[in-house]
């Protein structure tokens, strides 16, 4: 089975690097699924999105992302996010409280975190 090299990087840390069978991300143009052999592309990520990675040797990985870019080349997929956190690391109660924040950045971040938690719970 063909696979694709993927890197998920935020401003603060490298979240993941490895081989995957598919990557999905939410861009300003809509959700995109990337399989091996995808045409090169550069896309802007939404401010409250979710990235899903299906590693070739493990369970589905889901991260909340805020802003950034998705870069697809013949060699790899690179997701450069302004902010990213694994769904497993999200404090749901804290994220829900941030939904009421006046700060739009905090609100968007909380929305992304809660979306990631829901997506992770899906089959």
Swiss-Prot record:
Any one cellular component term from GO for this entry? plasma membrane
* Membrane topology designation: Peripheral membrane protein
Q: What GO MF terms are annotated?
A: ATP binding; proton-transporting ATP synthase activity, rotational mechanism
Which top-rank group of organisms is this from? Bacteria
Q: What is its subcellular localisation?
A: Cell membrane
What SUPFAM superfamilies does UniProt report for this protein, alphabetically? Answer: Epsilon subunit of F1F0-ATP synthase N-terminal domain
**Predominant location:** membrane
What keywords are assigned to this protein?
ATP synthesis, Cell membrane, CF(1), Hydrogen ion transport, Ion transport, Membrane, Transport
Name the family the entry cites.
Belongs to the ATPase epsilon chain family.
| Functional summary from the UniProt entry | Produces ATP from ADP in the presence of a proton gradient across the membrane.
Could you tell me which PANTHER family the record lists for this protein?
ATP SYNTHASE DELTA/EPSILON CHAIN, ATP SYNTHASE EPSILON CHAIN, CHLOROPLASTIC
Subunit structure as annotated in this protein's UniProt entry: F-type ATPases have 2 components, CF(1) - the catalytic core - and CF(0) - the membrane proton channel. CF(1) has five subunits: alpha(3), beta(3), gamma(1), delta(1), epsilon(1). CF(0) has three main subunits: a, b and c.
- Under what name is this protein listed? ATP synthase epsilon chain
Q: Say which species the protein is native to.
A: Corynebacterium diphtheriae (strain ATCC 700971 / NCTC 13129 / Biotype gravis)
């Amino acid at each position: 089975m063909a696979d694709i090299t993927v890197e998920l990087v935020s401003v603060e840390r490298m979240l993941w690097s490895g081989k995957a069978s598919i990557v999905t991300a939410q861009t300003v143009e809509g959700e995109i699924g990337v399989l091996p052999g995808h045409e090169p592309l550069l896309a802007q990520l939404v401010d409250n999105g979710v990235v899903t990675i299906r590693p070739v040797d493990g369970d589905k990985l889901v991260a909340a992302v805020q802003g950034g870019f998705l870069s697809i080349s013949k060699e790899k997929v690179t997701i450069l996010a302004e902010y990213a956190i694994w769904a497993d690391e999200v404090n749901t109660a804290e994220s829900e409280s941030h939904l009421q924040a006046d700060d739009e950045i905090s609100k968007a971040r909380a929305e992304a975190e809660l979306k990631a938690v829901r997506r992770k719970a899906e089959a």
